[in-house]
From Swiss-Prot:
Main localization, broad class: membrane
GO MF annotation terms: NADH dehydrogenase (ubiquinone) activity; NADH:ubiquinone reductase (non-electrogenic) activity; quinone binding
Protein name (record): NADH-quinone oxidoreductase subunit A
Protein family: Belongs to the complex I subunit 3 family.
Membrane topology of this protein: Multi-pass membrane protein
Catalytic activity: a quinone + NADH + 5 H(+)(in) = a quinol + NAD(+) + 4 H(+)(out)
GO cellular component, one term: NADH dehydrogenase complex
Cross-referenced HAMAP family: NDH1_NuoA (MF_01394)
Gene it is expressed from: nuoA
UniProt keyword list: Cell inner membrane, Cell membrane, Membrane, NAD, Quinone, Translocase, Transmembrane, Transmembrane helix, Transport, Ubiquinone
E.C. designation(s): 7.1.1.-
Subunit comment: NDH-1 is composed of 13 different subunits. Subunits NuoA, H, J, K, L, M, N constitute the membrane sector of the complex.
Amino-acid biosynthesis found in the keyword field: no
Amino acid sequence: MSMSTTTEVIAHYWAFAVFLIGALGLCSLMLLGARYLGGRAQARAKHVPYESGLDSVGSARLRMSAKFYLVAMFFVIFDVEALFLYAWAVSVREVGWLGFIEAAVFIAILLAGLFYLVRIGALNWTPVRSRRETAGKSHVRLTSGKHPQQ
């Protein structure tokens, strides 16, 4: 490496080196300041997680219903849909009618998937037994002895 090339490299990267040294120095200063200036609690409750003022009872390892995971997956799917539609909305003038048709087909496919999920009961939170029990009942309440349509 010649002298002019080394000087050019140093001139090119000096700002990054100053930034890196400053960032590491600031992090070290904050960590050391917290170590020497912070309080030290030696109580038994120091290692117990905070539970909104309530004492912890039982194990934190609880079995979760699979429906929570389904809702999370649905959220991710429709969040990605929103991301694609946002990208389309930003470029709507450049893509023209062809882009509009593609977006409409995309939305139609997603709506068909949503209707399918509703039809198979993937979004239904009640147990199958209680759905069967309420299927035969009328949702009309009688306030008097007469039927509401009489």
